[in-house]
């Protein structure tokens, strides 16, 4: 079974965790922005709005 040879330093560990957390924060912000856009009806690229559905029928 593969095991690490040496203990990872705290600074290296903290850098990696900071990177992961930053990436997660960026993705969360994108998700919130997309959700707000959909809820306010400003998005035209995800779901068709109710007005467009009425025109098609």
Swiss-Prot record:
Cellular compartments per GO CC: large ribosomal subunit
Family: Belongs to the bacterial ribosomal protein bL32 family.
Chain residue ranges for the region called Disordered: 1-23
Name recorded for this polypeptide: Large ribosomal subunit protein bL32
Keyword check for Ribosomal protein: yes
Molecular function as annotated in GO: structural constituent of ribosome
InterPro entries for the chain: Ribosomal_bL32 (IPR002677), Ribosomal_bL32_plant/cyanobact (IPR044958), Ribosomal_zn-bd (IPR011332)
HAMAP family from the UniProt entry: Ribosomal_bL32 (MF_00340)
Annotated keywords: Ribonucleoprotein, Ribosomal protein
An annotated GO BP: translation
Pfam families, per database record: Ribosomal_L32p
Species in which this protein is naturally found: Trichormus variabilis (strain ATCC 29413 / PCC 7937) (Anabaena variabilis)
């Amino acid at each position: 079974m593969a095991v690490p040879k040496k203990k990872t330093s705290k600074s290296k560990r903290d850098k990696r965790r900071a990177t992961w957390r930053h990436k997660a924060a960026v993705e969360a912000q994108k998700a919130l922005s997309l959700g707000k856009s959909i809820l306010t009806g400003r998005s035209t690229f995800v779901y068709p709005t109710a007005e467009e559905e009425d025109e098609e029928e």
